[in-house]
Amino acid sequence: DIQMTQTPSSLSASLGDRVTISCRASQDINNYLNWYRQKPDGTVKLLIYYTSRLHSGVPSRFSGSGSGTDYSLTISNLEQEDISTYFCQQGNALPRTFGGGTKLEIKR
């Protein structure tokens, strides 16, 4: 199975900040990298697919980049509603494995 290593595991930032979450695959995944978020109520939503393509309805404050084994998710102009746990997932090979998650909190 392809192992996905996601960093950091937790992140605290202020409203308006820009934050970046990284994900590294144990082998080349040919840009088949998706990003999801899980809200505190358990709701899961796809944000980005195929490295950088925004899912319908996702604001342009979210962006993805990367290639080969190294990928990142950037959230600009952080908003209160962005409080979530974010996960990367590779879709290049079965099983479609996930990173361990990044819990994003807002500094008060």
Swiss-Prot record:
Annotated GO biological process: adaptive immune response; immune response
Ranges for region Complementarity-determining-2: 50-56
Disulfides per UniProt: C23-C88
Region (Framework-1): 1-23
Gene3D superfamilies attached to this UniProt entry: Immunoglobulins
Positions of region (Complementarity-determining-3): 89-97
Pfam entry (one): V-set
PANTHER family attached to this UniProt entry: IMMUNOGLOBULIN LIGHT CHAIN
Region (Complementarity-determining-1): 24-34
UniProt miscellaneous comment: Anti-arsonate hybridoma protein.
SUPFAM superfamilies linked to this entry: Immunoglobulin (SSF48726)
Cellular component aspect of the GO annotation: immunoglobulin complex
Name the UniProt record assigns to this protein: Ig kappa chain V-V region HP 91A3
This protein's UniProt keywords: Adaptive immunity, Disulfide bond, Immunity, Immunoglobulin
Sequence segments annotated as region (Framework-3): 57-88
Segments for region (Framework-2): 35-49
